[in-house]
Swiss-Prot record:
Keywords: ATP-binding, Ligase, Nucleotide-binding, Protein biosynthesis. One of its GO terms (biological process) is translation. Allows the formation of correctly charged Asn-tRNA(Asn) or Gln-tRNA(Gln) through the transamidation of misacylated Asp-tRNA(Asn) or Glu-tRNA(Gln) in organisms which lack either or both of asparaginyl-tRNA or glutaminyl-tRNA synthetases. The reaction takes place in the presence of glutamine and ATP through an activated phospho-Asp-tRNA(Asn) or phospho-Glu-tRNA(Gln). This is Aspartyl/glutamyl-tRNA(Asn/Gln) amidotransferase subunit B. Heterotrimer of A, B and C subunits. Gene3D superfamilies: 1.10.10.410. It holds the Pfam family GatB_N. SMART domains: GatB_Yqey (SM00845). Coiled coil: none annotated.
Length: 504
């Protein structure tokens, strides 16, 4: 077994080999009922309370296809630029494992609902990489195993296992890429970018929340290496059920290094499934990988073929929303920002909050400033996502409005935001409770300016001598005297007027 200490460096691996990837992503569709029966798909129910003879595989139970599941699959296929089959059918994928009570999984084999598509993804530097899609097919999820005892939570070393069949039969769409070649050293980044873009697309379509941490979206990372200049693919490994964007990238990177180490030592790569470990960033062997013939696929005799009419497909196409990449490019042009700026917004999870704040009346620059500034810092400090903060886009827009009206300056606005986050009420309530209003009384400002000049005669002389930049010290003195509640720009104007100096 190759350990992390046996790995060759990533650079050395890429010096000798080209990585070839294949990504299989399973997405749980957000239907109200399961794929082939009427059982609820709601989360949080007691174990084995959302089952029936169909999803438990009882003799004589007959399935029926969930039409919403089919429609969701077509939406995904169209959004991935796939061809939609005029006729497709389900098949039985036969294997024995405790979490599959029927001893077969109802899936699609040689006749998927969608095929031959692509998805363009943007990398960190703004470069676009096209990932070709082999197919997208419908199937059902398995039950859930809970392995009790042992140190890893896996079946090996466990004293016993518990089974919950509530998940068995939940609709899935599996999206399979064609071999991803030509990414070179950026292959792990491409894998991460692809899964991220696919997740955003799924969410935009409204067919799933695609929350990886909850198992609603899972990625299998297939990887092989081949020596430079060789066309034939190497033997692949499949790292199963990777459940975060970061882990997808780390799993691909580790497997590149592991494969290279084995090949450099004259070893042979075994076609197998592997498990990814978050704590170490490494993978370990699972089981020898089956080929399609090992599953003895055959057409599902209890279900008729699915034949979506062209009219229905076009109706679905006409109702598709603006897709994420198109939307981002449009917003980037409207806002006049760079690709790197947009990528930073995406990485922070700030795009939707910013758009919602603009929709609530704020200008784009102000919305970006607050979400990417004070609110991003608060999210990082609290370990929360931006959309988990106790402030709404409407409230952020109100803060921006108060600044625009001159009732708050940036310093006071930050205090208002912190007050809202602390649960002190709406922005207006925080302003009233804390007494956070810009000092707009000219008499009060003039008095504060006179006192600052009188208390700093040396600075005043420098300003009179033409060093306008020195006015910052007097502005600071006034801001301190007014507890930050003065309009700094107006204070500077008054200082220069008092000293008879024109702005540079």
């Amino acid at each position: 077994m190759t350990t992390t200490t046996d790995l060759v460096s990533y650079e050395d691996a890429l010096a000798s080999y080209d990585p070839v990837m294949g990504l299989e992503v399973h997405v749980e569709l957000g239907t109200k009922t399961k794929m082939f029966c009427g059982c609820s798909t709601a989360l949080g129910a007691d174990p084995n309370t959302q089952t029936c003879p169909v999803c438990l595989g009882m003799p004589g139970a007959l399935p029926a296809v969930n039409a919403t599941g089919v429609e969701s699959a077509i939406k995904i296929g169209l959004a991935l630029n796939c061809e939609i089959a005029e006729w497709c059918r389900f098949a039985r994928k036969n294997y024995f494992y405790p979490d599959m009570p029927k001893n077969f999984q109802t899936s699609q084999y040689d006749e998927p609902i969608a095929f031959d598509g692509y998805l363009d993804v943007q990398l960190e530097d703004g470069e676009t990489f096209r990932v070709q899609i082999e197919r997208a097919h419908m199937e059902e999820d398995t039950g859930k195993s809970l392995h009790v005892g042992g140190a890893t939570g896996r079946i090996h070393g466990a004293s016993h296992s518990l089974l919950d069949y509530n998940r068995a039969g939940i609709p899935l769409i599996e999206i399979v890429t064609k071999p991803i070649e030509g990414a070179g050293e950026r292959a792990p980044e491409v894998a991460r970018a692809y899964v991220r873009e696919l997740r955003e697309l799924i969410r935009a379509l409204g067919v799933s929340e695609a929350r990886m941490e909850m198992g609603q979206m899972r990625c299998d990372v297939n990887l092989s290496l081949r020596p430079h200049g060789r066309e034939k693919f190497g033997t692949r490994s499949e790292t199963k059920n990777v459940n975060s964007l970061r882990s997808v990238e780390r799993a691909a990177r580790f497997e590149i290094q592991r494969h290279a180490a084995v090949l450099n030592d004259g070893g042979t790569i075994i076609q197998e499934t592997r498990h990814f470990h978050e704590d170490t960033g490494s993978t370990t062997s699972g089981r020898v990988k089956e080929e399609a013939e090992d599953y003895r696929y055959f057409p599902e005799p209890d279900l008729v073929p699915v034949a979506p009419s062209r009219q229905w497909v076009e109706e679905i196409r006409s109702g598709l929303p603006e897709l994420p990449l198109v939307r981002r490019n449009r917003l980037r042009e409207e806002w006049g920002i760079s690709g790197n700026d947009m990528q930073s917004i995406l990485n922070a999870g700030a795009l939707d909050p910013i758009v919602a704040t603009i929709d609530a009346g704020a200008d784009a620059a102000s919305a970006r400033k607050w979400w990417m500034g004070e609110l991003a810092r608060s999210a990082n400090e609290s370990g929360k996502a931006l959309d988990e903060l106790a402030i709404t886009p409407v409230q952020v827009a109100r803060v921006a409005e108060l600044v625009t009206k001159g009732e708050l300056n940036d310093k006071l606005a930050r205090q208002v935001i912190l007050g809202v986050l602390a649960g002190e009420g709406t922005p207006d309530e925080v302003v009233d409770k804390r007494g956070l209003k810009v000092v707009s009384d000219e008499g009060a400002l003039t008095t504060a300016v006179d006192e600052a000049i009188a208390g700093n005669p040396g600075v005043a002389d420098k300003i009179r001598g033409g060093k306008v930049a020195a006015a910052g010290a007097l502005v600071g003195a006034v801001m301190k005297a007014t507890r930050g509640q003065a309009d700094a720009a107006r204070v500077k104007e008054l200082i220069l007027e008092k000293l008879g100096v024109a702005e540079g």
